[in-house]
C-alpha cells in the first residue's frame, strides 16, 4: 500500500452529509467534548486519580493517569476538530475497554458500567465511519486528492 493510499484509507469517511453525517457529527463532537473534560479532570484531581488507578490494580498508576489524561484530552480535541478520527477513536475505545475491565470490575456503578461501555460503542462507530464531511480529515483528504 502506497503512503497516499494509506492516507486515503485512514481519512476517507464512510458517510458524508445527510442525516447520517449530521448524526455522526453530533456523536463525534459530543463525545470529543466529554473526553476533553474527563482528560483535563484527571490532571485537576491528579493524586486522587493516581490513588484510584492504584486501587484498580493498574500498573504504574502515575504514568497511566498521565497517559490516559493526555489521550482523553488531546484525543477529545482531535474528535471535536475531526482530526485523525479513526486512529483516535480506536485508541479511546481501547482506553474505555481498560476502564471497564479495571474500574468497572472493582467499582461498577453508572459511569464504569454505563457511560464507559456506551463510549466504547460510540468510539467503535467513529472508528468505522471516520470524520464525515464536517471534519479536518475530510479537508486533508480533499487536498491529498487534489495533489
Regions found by a protein language model. Give the residues of each.
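Extended, low-polarity transmembrane helix blocks
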Residues: 1-44, 63-70, 74, 81-147
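Membrane-interface interhelical connector segments
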Residues: 7-8, 44-60
Amino acid at each position: 500500500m502506497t503512503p497516499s493510499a494509506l492516507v486515503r484509507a485512514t481519512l476517507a469517511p464512510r458517510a458524508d452529509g445527510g442525516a447520517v453525517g449530521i448524526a455522526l457529527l453530533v456523536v463525534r463532537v459530543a463525545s470529543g467534548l466529554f473526553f476533553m473534560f474527563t482528560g483535563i479532570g484527571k490532571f485537576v484531581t491528579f493524586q486522587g486519580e493516581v490513588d484510584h488507578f492504584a486501587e484498580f490494580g493498574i500498573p504504574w498508576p502515575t504514568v497511566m493517569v498521565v497517559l490516559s489524561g493526555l489521550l482523553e484530552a488531546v484525543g477529545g480535541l482531535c474528535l471535536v476538530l475531526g482530526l485523525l478520527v479513526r486512529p483516535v477513536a480506536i485508541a479511546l475505545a481501547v482506553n474505555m475497554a481498560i476502564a471497564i475491565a479495571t474500574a468497572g470490575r472493582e467499582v461498577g456503578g453508572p459511569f464504569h458500567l454505563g457511560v464507559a461501555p456506551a463510549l466504547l460503542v460510540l468510539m467503535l462507530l467513529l472508528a468505522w465511519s471516520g470524520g464525515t464531511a464536517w471534519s479536518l480529515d475530510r479537508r486533508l483528504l480533499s487536498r491529498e486528492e487534489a495533489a
